[in-house]
Regions:
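Conserved catalytic cores of ATP-dependent inositol ring kinases
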Residues: 1-484
Length: 484
């Protein structure tokens, strides 16, 4: 088979905000044609979508940043994307699939963008105009001009866009509808500061950290430390589990009128990867004045319940994320490991080569609050945010009693043999931290490493137990890297 990608009208383009005088650059080449060994051709056509904005912002408050404007970092781009319109069998001259779209109605970005006061030269116009950008939704997919799949969505400017129904219509006119239901509590507005370490809603509003006054006051060391601790506490997860489930999928109702219900609970961890990414430590932050960090943020599936059309429970799968499970207690210490240390307040000593060679101080002191914590390696090293070493799956009745024993799944996780590895060599690697005290280590969250993320999260064993906790069956899994 031969796969052909790209083409002027089959490519996404972008235009960097900081390089607005540049020409648009191609960033994604979509599949345009498939040719079989027999010469049969399938062609994909696309249509232009409305322009979009993509990017991120972060802040760093440092004692050396005397002007609050210098502490802001932003990286945005203008996107010119395309969307799939048709799939055509060129050889047989027939349309295999058609895709139809329309503008969506959903929660927009605030017209008074929270970050505009932190720009060097006043508000950035395209930020304040971001609410005017149109986001399309997929309305229907038609297969062979015979089978029609239709999609309906929420239609409100006060909530995120969510799929409500999927309806299949056959050539004979028979319809089958799947309905999706969500938790009714709404997420807050965009860029308002209501999020935990993993980006989930936790109800804490720390948007005042984006104000000019905060940046001006935070150049004082004592205030900066106090603000840094408060910021850290506000990034903790929602222990109660109400806010973190906002607008999450709650249930699916099938054409038979049966349904599947999803029950969630907050993530709970017992360990976290140290800030220098060398060890696994207990779930506590490395400086005083901060609480236990066993609730880092986000949520996990707790139960999956299936009901018939009369609302009678058919099956229930209950998941336990613990190291030591017994049929009687069903609890214990969490097997969860956070892939980073959620540290936002830093006191650094950075090695200064030039000064040390000229009789000056060897280290340069820097104190800072950083909005991105100690996770700069999220995108090339961390793997998952949280890894669970053991997950127990139980089939239970409506009273929570085991029906046919339970199954223990063991996964590879941070620890011996699965930590990221040192680079072969690195320049200027002298690094230490004043706050919290940690002197002389050559490692930091920013030290390059060889990632072992692909080794983590792999199923190592699957054990089936009876009611009394006796092993009935055990499977072991081994993996060999293709190359290293």
């Amino acid at each position: 088979y031969k796969y052909i990608f790209g083409g002027t009208d089959k490519t996404d383009y972008n235009l960097p905000f900081k390089g607005f005088l540049n020409l648009p650059a191609p960033i994604t080449w979509h599949l345009s044609k498939i040719i079989t060994p027999a010469g049969h051709e399938i062609e994909f056509t696309y249509e232009i979508m409305p322009f979009q904005i993509n990017g991120n912002m972060s802040f760093c408050i440092s004692l050396d940043a005397l002007f609050w404007q210098t502490a802001m970092s932003y990286d945005y781009e203008l996107l010119a994307p395309v969307q799939l319109a048709t799939v055509k069998d060129v050889t047989d001259n027939k349309i295999l699939a058609r895709f139809h779209y329309s503008p969506s109605t959903q929660l927009p970005y605030d017209s008074q963008y929270a970050w505009e006061t932190c720009m060097d030269h006043g508000p950035a116009t395209f930020f304040t105009k971001e609410k005017n950008f149109t986001l399309n939704k997929l309305n229907s997919v038609v297969i062979l001009d015979k089978i029609n799949y239709q999609f309906t969505y929420t239609n409100s400017s006060t909530e995120r866009l969510k799929l409500k129904t999927l309806t299949k219509t056959t050539p004979s006119g028979t319809q089958s509808t799947y309905s999706l239901n969500y938790f009714p509590n709404h997420l807050p507005g965009y860029n308002t500061g209501h999020y935990d370490n993993l980006g989930f809603n936790n109800g804490e509003n720390f948007s005042y950290y984006f104000s000019k006054e905060f940046f001006e006051n935070a150049i004082f060391a004592d205030k900066q430390i106090a603000e840094g601790k408060e910021y850290t506490n506000k990034r903790m997860g929602d222990k109660g589990g109400f806010r973190v489930t906002a607008e999450m999928l709650k249930s699916i109702t099938y054409p038979t009128h049966g349904r599947t219900e999803f029950i969630y609970e907050p993530n709970v961890i017992s360990s976290m990867v140290s800030a220098d990414r060398k060890t696994v430590q207990s779930a506590h932050l490395p400086y005083p004045g901060t609480p236990d960090y066993t609730y880092p943020g986000g949520l996990r599936i707790k139960e999956i319940n299936n009901y018939d059309s009369n609302d009678e429970l058919l099956t229930r799968k209950h998941y336990y994320y613990t190291k030591e499970f017994t049929p009687t207690t069903k609890g214990g210490v969490s097997s969860g490991i956070l892939s980073f240390t959620p540290q936002y307040l830093w006191g650094w000593q950075l090695y200064n080569l030039l000064k040390s060679q000229n009789g000056g101080p060897e280290y340069y002191t820097l104190n800072a609050i950083m909005s991105q914590a100690s996770n700069p390696l999220w995108y090339n090293s961390r793997g998952e945010y949280i890894g669970y070493s053991k997950v127990i799956e139980c089939n239970e009745d409506k009273n929570g009693k085991l029906i046919d024993g339970y199954t223990v799944h063991t996964f590879s996780n941070f620890g011996q043999g699965y930590m990221d590895e040192d680079p072969i060599a690195i320049l200027n690697n002298k690094f230490s931290r004043e706050y919290p005290p940690h002197f002389g280590t050559p490692y930091s969250p920013y030290t390059p490493c060889s990632s072992n993320a692909l080794k983590r999260g792999m199923l190592l064993s699957k054990e089936q137990f009876d009611y009394a906790g006796h092993v009935k069956q055990k499977e072991l899994f081994e993996y060999t890297p293709i190359q290293k």
